[in-house]
Structure formats: C-alpha cells, structure tokens
Swiss-Prot record:
NCBIfam families the record matches: rRNA_mod_RlmN
Stated role: Specifically methylates position 2 of adenine 2503 in 23S rRNA and position 2 of adenine 37 in tRNAs.
Organism: Clostridium botulinum (strain Eklund 17B / Type B)
Substrates-to-products reaction catalysed: adenosine(2503) in 23S rRNA + 2 reduced [2Fe-2S]-[ferredoxin] + 2 S-adenosyl-L-methionine = 2-methyladenosine(2503) in 23S rRNA + 5'-deoxyadenosine + L-methionine + 2 oxidized [2Fe-2S]-[ferredoxin] + S-adenosyl-L-homocysteine; adenosine(37) in tRNA + 2 reduced [2Fe-2S]-[ferredoxin] + 2 S-adenosyl-L-methionine = 2-methyladenosine(37) in tRNA + 5'-deoxyadenosine + L-methionine + 2 oxidized [2Fe-2S]-[ferredoxin] + S-adenosyl-L-homocysteine
Protein name, as recorded: Probable dual-specificity RNA methyltransferase RlmN
HAMAP family: RNA_methyltr_RlmN
Domain (Radical SAM core): residue spans on this chain: 96-326
EC number(s) reported in the record: 2.1.1.192
Record-listed S-adenosyl-L-methionine binding positions: G157, E158, S189, S212, L213, H214, N288
Record-listed [4Fe-4S] cluster binding positions: C110, C114, C117
GO biological process: rRNA base methylation; tRNA methylation
Amino acid sequence: MKNILDYTLEELTLWMKENNESSFRAKQIMSWIYKDVRNFSDMRNMPKSLIAKLEENFEIALPEIEEIYKSELDGTEKFLFKFSDGNLIESVLMRYKHGNSICISTQVGCRMGCKFCASTIDGRIRNLTTGEILAQILVVQNHIGERISNVVLMGSGEPLDNYENVMKFLDIVSAEYGLNIGQRHITLSTCGIVPKIYELADKELSITLAISLHAFSDEKRKEIMPIANKYSIDEILNACKYFVNKTKRRITFEYSLVKDVNDSKEDARALGKLLKGMLCHVNLIPVNEIKERTFKRSSKETIQDFANILSNLGIEVTVRREMGSDINAACGQLRRSYIKTQETRGE
C-alpha cells in the first residue's frame, strides 16, 4: 500500500484521472491531510466510492513517537521516531519568540563519515521517503498543537544524498496545498556534494543553503570529513558562488570548533581570507562531544576569539546558541543510545 504523503498534488491529480475520478478531488484530499485528518473516512466531502478506492490503495503512514526528551531550560524537545520497519530517527523542536523551528532527518544513519557526527557511525541504513520526511513535521505539530514555522534539514543523514525525495519534500512543504512553510524559512545543510549543489541552484529556490565546511584547507578537512577526498574546497566554493548567483541567497558556512584541531587564530584568519568577498555568513558551532570520538570542544574564550577575528576581517559571524543543553545529545546519539539500551534489555 502506498503512503499518500509521498504524493505531490500533481501526482495525486494524475492518479485521480487514471482512476476515473474528478481532478479537483486531489486538492480536497490534500487539504484534509494537511489539516491533520488521518482517516480517509473522515474526509466529509468525499463520495463513499472514492473513499473506498483511497482505502484500498493508500495509507496515511506516520511514525510512532518512541521517546520525547524535554529541556527544563528552554522547552527544546527531542523526538525519537520509530517507523513501521523498526528503524529509528530523530527530530528536534526548538521554541523561539518568532515561532517554532524543527530540525529533521532525511536518512536513517548516514554514509558521509564525518568524524564529529554520531549519526554516521553505523553508516547509512536507508533513505527516508518524502512522506517520512514530511511526517516528522506533521507528528510534532499534532503533538504540540502549534504550527511549525521554520524547518532545518540538519538531522541524521545527508539531504543531497537523498536528492529526489528531499526535492519533492521541499515542493510539498512550501506549497499552499501542503504545509505552506515559506522557502525562506527552510534551511538545507550539506557536507558538500558538489554536483547536487549545482542542480539545487538551478531550481532557483529561496531556501538557505548551509555548507558544513569545518576547515579552511583540503588537508585539514580530509582529517575530519571523508567527502573532502572527493570534492575540494575550491570546487565547493565555486558551486556556492553559482548558487548565490542563481538564487541571490546568502550562503551559510557551518564551522564546528574542535579543540586543537581547527580552532586556532591562524585557522580563523585563513578562513576569513578564504571567504572574503562572498555573500556568506559563518555559523560557529561548539562541537558536540560524543564518546565514540576523541574530539573536545573549544573553550568559550577560544570560540569568541575566533569569532572576533572573522568579524574584524569583514565576515558576518554568529556563534550557535545552544538549545536544550540539559538534554544535550549530538545528532544521532539519541537513536544510538536507545538502540543500545534495548539490546541490553534483550528487547
């Protein structure tokens, strides 16, 4: 049975035509789904014959909430979801004065191998479908009874390694018939799959592109990010410049500061020189310490010095605000720790 959440309006309209149903029914069905109706029989303006066809061919498949961890400091909530095949993924809800933001996953695991990331330790298990990516937002919205206004594709997985499903997600999540979240309120984070950055640029979307850079030189980047063996920083920056030219959107460069690895004043000056003149912003991230890795986070003083150097070189820079520090877990850690707990219990 097919998950109707995987369908765009155009695809569902085509299905209606192929099954001798009126095309306008597709938009009505979408309206019900994104108003949180979870049973076709509850779609009151649908004829019984169509409801029967829908129930025969489709399901509205949503993951179960396996666990929720809520910060007592700022209300940040970390959700652990379980899909029907038993696979687990994580999403994080962050509450701000301007609205609710959610960080979602695009894959179960990840094959990129970044040394500071927990979600890549066991490799990529599978891609999430378009509907499974959307479902994270739908379930969280239903749980909190509030609208999600900002989406960040920065959870488990590399979005551009699941390109087709993620592009379809971007179509639906921003469409009026879908979740109607403006593209300017959506951020996609990538480790830098260069050909896909060009493809994304050609779509001329208004999303924010965030590049996980984390080093100023290929030599240093190769130490912590295997993708650097395939695509050089120059290639990534050229793709970013193409993206900026096509979309007129500022690029965000993410830079996780790791003690004694990439956090020196020389690193800061070299990074500033590398990015000077680009329409960009640097987001400095105190690295999350995970027990499977030896990386330690830089001191607050080192982070501030790094930020000051970039700022003095004319680079827009911010230090990422830590949310939910009392329930702190790096991306992928919640899933891994839960699986280990279940294995210990013999479940």
